[in-house]
Amino acid sequence: MDITELLAFSAKQGASDLHLSAGLPPMIRVDGDVRRINLPALDHKQVQALIYDIMNDTQRVDFEKHLETDFSFDVPGVARFRVNAFNQSRGAGAVFRTIPSRVLSMDELGMGEVFRKMTDAPRGLVLVTGPTGSGKSTTLAAMIDYLNNHRHHHILTIEDPIEFVHESRKCLINQREVHRDTRSFATALRSALREDPDVILVGEMRDLETIRLALTAAETGHLVFGTLHTTSAAKTIDRIVDVFPGDEKSMVRSMLSESLLAVVSQTLVKKIGGGRIAAHEIMLGTSAIRNLIREDKVAQMYSSIQSGGSLGMQTLDMGLKDLVTKGLVSREHAREKARSPDGF
């Protein structure tokens, strides 16, 4: 079985990931669980051959030099895949994350009116956060797709690598891949401010300079979407502020309080009948939240989110209870993801 056949099989099974690891048979992750494919174990040379088969010369050199590399790969008629190739104790390994060829709409994903309001904002910072594999890219792709169908904007994305491919409809969309089209997130963001964008998507806000430039872009009249690997809205604020040195923290809190539109922290939960759905914690940049950010009272944010339901805010547990009430998720699976399991 060649790599294209393996990836086609993986996509047909509804897998989020295909795992290749020397010394073991191929495995897939379906609905959050890793399962073995009924194939013989692959040795190092077989795994390496499968990986090298889809790499270009630059990617092979990068892999051999750094012992790991990231890239994306298309299987026409099947899907697009985000690939991480690496080495492990038994030899070569790789993980192929499935990126659906069709961008799901906000309606299909069950994203409510509050998400449309975020997307319709003329300027500000929207952060979508969560652990790896929590559906952040899917959520952001739906929001970009909504803009593409309803606004006449210039949308600039900076990604590592490009995941969902957007065709320009009403919007002009330029997608830039780090290490292919630009040297780094920070370099691309610095240029972005001179490229007449209305909307900027930053695939990952992973360092001080990128975060600083994203805040500046939001402050200077752009709608900026970004991701972080934090697990709650409050932790997201802490993470951003903590990146900066002590003498800049007050300034950063002030910038955040002025520009923050929303923090959406999400996790994927198993659905009744198969598949997974995102549960969201939603914190909006209300005057109360802005004051808490400015005054460094992050601990009080949770109660502000709880009491802001009429505005569209919700804690993760409120989001999980809503999914249970709608019959989409069982109490048991909601309890596994809840911050306060006793509430279920």
Where are these regions (language model features)?
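Short, flexible helix-loop junctions that flank or precede catalytic/ligand sites
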Residues: 1-344
